[in-house]
């Protein structure tokens, strides 16, 4: 386990946000200080979407295959488009590259039905520090 995860320096790490194009377009970083979701996104208006949380430890996503399968199964249950596992892995790898390897993190994949105006799914990945109190509960 990363011993540096609960250090004071780690608390200054800003979240990483990566926007995932559900049609396979470019993966792009998003400023975590700026809004991301539109007012008419189904995640906001109806809570319509799925998410999956992964542990990032030592610069890698843990149990990636298992999480990919569960994410796809959750999307299928809601009738959302099947997430492209390779594309989501690539987006996750890109997000992790911006995260310090010695700081444990949670990585959340989010896929929503999208905006009413476009009828196009919305998707993003966030990587953020695991709260110190959660790390302390593990010991």
Language model: regions and residue ranges:
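Conserved alpha/beta cores of soluble small-molecule-handling proteins
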Residues: 1-139
């Amino acid at each position: 386990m990363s011993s540096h995860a609960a250090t004071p320096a780690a608390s200054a790490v800003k979240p990483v946000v990566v926007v995932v194009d559900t049609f396979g377009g470019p993966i792009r970083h998003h400023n975590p200080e700026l809004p991301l979701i539109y007012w008419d996104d189904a995640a906001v208006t109806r809570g319509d979407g799925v998410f999956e949380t992964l542990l990032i430890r030592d610069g890698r996503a843990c149990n990636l295959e298992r999480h990919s399968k569960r994410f796809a199964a959750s999307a299928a249950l809601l009738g959302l488009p099947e997430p492209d596992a390779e594309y989501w892995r690539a987006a996750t790898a890109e997000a992790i590259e911006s995260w310090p390897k010695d700081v444990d993190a949670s990585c959340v994949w989010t896929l929503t039905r999208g905006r009413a105006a476009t009828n196009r799914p919305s998707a993003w990945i966030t990587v953020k520090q695991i709260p110190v109190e959660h790390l302390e509960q593990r010991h």
